Amino acid sequence: MDILIFVTAAAHLVYTPFTKVEESFNLQAMHDILYLRNNFTQYDHHDYPGVVPRTFIGPLVVSIISAPFVLLFETLSINKFWAQYVVRLVLAGAISVAWNSLRQAVTKIYGVEVRLWFTAITITQFHFMFYMTRPLPNIFALPIVLFAIAYWLRDQHKPFIICSGISILVFRSELALFLGILLVVSLLRRKVSIDGLLKVALPAGVCILAATVLVDSFFWRRLLWPEGEVLWYNTVLNKSSNWGTSPFLWYFYSALPRAMGASLVLVPIGVALEPRIRPLVLSALLFVLLYSILPHKELRFIIYVFPVLNIAAACACQRIWMNSAKSTWHSFLALACGAHLLLNVFITLFLLVISGTNYPGGAALSRLHRLEAGTSNVSVHISNLAAQSGVSRFMEINNEWTYSKDETMNYTQADLVAYTHLLVEAKNKQNTELWASLQNEFDTLEFIDCFNSIGIQYNSLLPVRIKTKPCIGILKKRPVAPKEASKTKEKIAKTKTYPVEKETLLAPVKEFPKVIGDPKMKSRLQVDADDDDGIVSTVEEMSLELETDTEPHAGAETIETPLKEINFQELRTLALGQATKKSRAATKMKIRQIIEQHYRAKGKQIENDSAETQKTQGKAGLRQSVKSIIKQEKIKEMIEQIATMDLTRICDLERTSTKDCLKQVIDKIDDSEGLKSK
């Protein structure tokens, strides 16, 4: 039965594979460690740091264990969404090992029968099994706490103190209450002395604190003790209440009944019948009582006490079952103990079905991947609700797609130009006008439902019904005729003033797939400076449409656009395919600006020559203007070529700036394509 706990947790994971915003830091951290590796500047936490910093130690350990599986997936070209299963199963495996250690301690103290009941009760409850695969700070602390409790039951106080220190200083500072109470009990029972405590606690505490400060300061780029900042924010400043408050006794009348299910009624019976369990259970309940002082409450905050209470319930079941032959009443009670497990299973199935409707964002992006399978150059914007309810970097499985979680999105016409698809909150009273405007340009492919409420149905075998409502809409931009597109661009140009660093006179760049290890990519990174064929990549010919809005504005040649400096590392990261979607777009925008600026500098002479030619040659001058427009269209191809080059093979970057090197490359490509005006 030992493997059952892991298998049950895995079943919960398969049914609910997505995650919520509370899990995002650890999940994104594991993704970045596994896929971005030493490209630390592109890690997700730099763009989305969260309210308080969290430790990287948990994600780092899980990622190290998961790395061989992820490398195998990459070798077999298995998309990285399956790697999310791997890291979460590794976390569940760690908890299973720790839980098994606790189970062995229970066997040694209370007997084999209690162990069997303990296992049966645990796997039939919902919340403990469900949270085993959730990458939350509390869950990273859970296996260490289970080891600590097991050591405490065995009176092995040195490893108990070390495990307590790790869980408190690295993961969850509030565990000082629970594990501190257990330590006080040991001191009062004289199972450990103060001298012995200090000899272990002081050096262990210093080493543990130094480890978390060293590791996390490196990843966060500042001197940092993450759990110290969390403690200050939640406890001293009491700002955790910004995320909601609950009544003082909420843990007792809401969290514990839901987590324990029918087993809760057996806990006091177990405490009454088994004196040896009382110190542990009372310590756990005292921890819950003290922790109730903080107004912000969540069930996962007290998940560490569930196994302790289950031991008490198992003791009750064992005593009742052992006496089942004494009388009819005892037989009935024994039958009730077995039946309560079946009731737990029904509660678990009901809660699991509800839980499956709580991740509309993940379901929406997964559905979009199926709907648009085989479609390239997709740019999808992920709304805030979608990002908080299931979307993670593990779901960015298509290298030809652009995934954006831009929080400044206002859904204006200018904002929507960049996107082909939207995951947007479904229509409600607050966003009626938004949906009215979106339906002018986008078609609704599907709606993804999420949990709404629980209803009662009297004319059905199942009296309880789970009600859902549309939460996320999947939208796709309608194809636009060239003339309409031209009018739209003119309208946008009149109504919106672009920031200087985003200003452009050209159509948006099409995204091309970037695959690390692609032979074509490698050949591009190894070109020589005098090899025109190497510099000029073979790209698919783009259709060239002469649009009325491609002509520069009057006086444009006199304006020198200020640029954010582009550096070699940005280009190198882009060429190797290691850049994030956000940084890749920013780097390409800088390349585009340099090309436009360089062309404007050359374009003055071209325009003057063209004007003189038109006076003398008429139609020949007109053909020259057409060539100039075609040249502007070719810039889109040029950006893609530059994005795959290794500039160290072309320029001496110790003597030449990156910007000047890019200008040399532009001229080289320009010459090879025959685009220069003659």
UniProtKB/Swiss-Prot annotation:
BP-aspect Gene Ontology terms: dolichol-linked oligosaccharide biosynthetic process; protein glycosylation; protein N-linked glycosylation
Transmembrane stretches, start-end: 1-21, 56-76, 81-101, 109-129, 133-153, 168-188, 200-220, 252-272, 279-299, 301-321, 334-354
Gene Ontology CC: one annotated term: endoplasmic reticulum membrane
PANTHER family on file: DOL-P-MAN:MAN(7)GLCNAC(2)-PP-DOL ALPHA-1,6-MANNOSYLTRANSFERASE, GLYCOSYLTRANSFERASE
Name of this protein: Dol-P-Man:Man(7)GlcNAc(2)-PP-Dol alpha-1,6-mannosyltransferase
Protein family (similarity comment): Belongs to the glycosyltransferase 22 family.
Function: Mannosyltransferase that operates in the biosynthetic pathway of dolichol-linked oligosaccharides, the glycan precursors employed in protein asparagine (N)-glycosylation. The assembly of dolichol-linked oligosaccharides begins on the cytosolic side of the endoplasmic reticulum membrane and finishes in its lumen. The sequential addition of sugars to dolichol pyrophosphate produces dolichol-linked oligosaccharides containing fourteen sugars, including two GlcNAcs, nine mannoses and three glucoses.
Subcellular locations according to the entry: Endoplasmic reticulum membrane
EC numbers for this chain: 2.4.1.260
Molecular functions per Gene Ontology: alpha-1,6-mannosyltransferase activity; dolichyl-P-Man:Man(7)GlcNAc(2)-PP-dolichol alpha-1,6-mannosyltransferase
Keyword Transmembrane helix carried by entry: yes
Catalytic reaction annotation: an alpha-D-Man-(1->2)-alpha-D-Man-(1->2)-alpha-D-Man-(1->3)-[alpha-D-Man-(1->2)-alpha-D-Man-(1->3)-alpha-D-Man-(1->6)]-beta-D-Man-(1->4)-beta-D-GlcNAc-(1->4)-alpha-D-GlcNAc-diphospho-di-trans,poly-cis-dolichol + a di-trans,poly-cis-dolichyl beta-D-mannosyl phosphate = an alpha-D-Man-(1->2)-alpha-D-Man-(1->2)-alpha-D-Man-(1->3)-[alpha-D-Man-(1->2)-alpha-D-Man-(1->3)-[alpha-D-Man-(1->6)]-alpha-D-Man-(1->6)]-beta-D-Man-(1->4)-beta-D-GlcNAc-(1->4)-alpha-D-GlcNAc-diphospho-di-trans,poly-cis-dolichol + a di-trans,poly-cis-dolichyl phosphate + H(+)
Pathway where this protein functions: Protein modification; protein glycosylation
Keywords recorded for this protein, A-Z: Endoplasmic reticulum, Glycosyltransferase, Membrane, Transferase, Transmembrane, Transmembrane helix
Membrane topology label: Multi-pass membrane protein
Record InterPro entries: GPI_mannosylTrfase
